[in-house]
C-alpha cells in the first residue's frame, strides 16, 4: 500500500 500522505515512501 502506498502511503504518501505524510510524505514518506513505503513499499507498494
From Swiss-Prot:
Its main location: secreted. One of its GO terms (biological process) is neuropeptide signaling pathway. Keywords: Neuropeptide, Secreted. GO terms for cellular component: extracellular region. It is found in: Secreted. Disulfide bonds: none annotated. Coiled coil: none annotated. The keyword Secreted applies. The keyword Manganese does not apply. FMRFamides and FMRFamide-like peptides are neuropeptides. Belongs to the FARP (FMRF amide related peptide) family. This is Extended FMRFamide-10. It comes from Mantophasma kudubergense. The lineage of its organism: Eukaryota, Metazoa, Ecdysozoa, Arthropoda, Hexapoda.
